Amino acid sequence: GLMLRSGNDAAVALAIALGGSVEGFAAQMNERAAQLGLAHTHFTNPHGLPAEGHYTSALDLARITCAAYENAAFRRIVQTEYAVIPWTGHEFDRAMRNKNKLLTAYEGANGVKTGYTKAAGRCLVSGAERDGMQLIAVTLNAPDMWRDAAALLDYGFAAYEMREVLSMGEIVGSVPCADAQGGALPVAAATAGRIPLKAGEEPFLRLILPESVSSPVAQGQFLGYAILGTGEEELARVPLRAAAQAVRPRWTYGRSLQRVLAHWFAADDSQRE
């Protein structure tokens, strides 16, 4: 009812259930907006009807959608063309059809949401996926929003292609570890890293890893991330895992004596200098 039929009553009901009140839920929305780095968004209600202090931008809507697309249930709902739900108090169920015409008119369309108010005009957040590349297009106050959205998506698919920057299992670096073979643990990409790039565009790869690790470390243990992107923009994060193990040496009398003697001789040599 909320996403397929733009149910404002459903939005209010969900807000009260999750936030205790419309105002409480709006505060949660603004907190999440801050986490996403949305500089041009502020919410005062859950349904989007005009209100003082309630605003957003096309870029922020695209970022919100990218975050929402990480939720499998959201992705499933926004690409549902038709649904039948129980209708309390009636002998028959209620049918709901998605208002997003692109779902049946545009190749690869998989969302997202229509919207209209007199103040904002006809608005559409649209999404489509082809060859593993997901695009989001946002049109605001667009009388011909279907054609405009299709044109934006067409441009995106023509101008960009998905490129594999990292292969699954590829060694990208190492982390110092005293008990690892050679004194360092090799680090590998846990998944393939693919990002959309224009022709001739070169990506960057930055590693987020600890300065060192202590044993024991299991092979496959999470150690950090590889950041992929272009310019200054981060486009993807690939988990990094240990490509080998580091086992803590077992304590033995001989090993302990060896360490004590090594420390003693090192101290003695320093006193002679």
Predicted regions and their residues:
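Active-site-adjacent loops and short helices of periplasmic peptidoglycan-processing enzymes
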Residues: 1-59, 63-72
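Domain-terminus/edge residues, biased toward the C-terminal soluble/receptor-binding domains
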Residues: 38-39, 50-55, 59-273
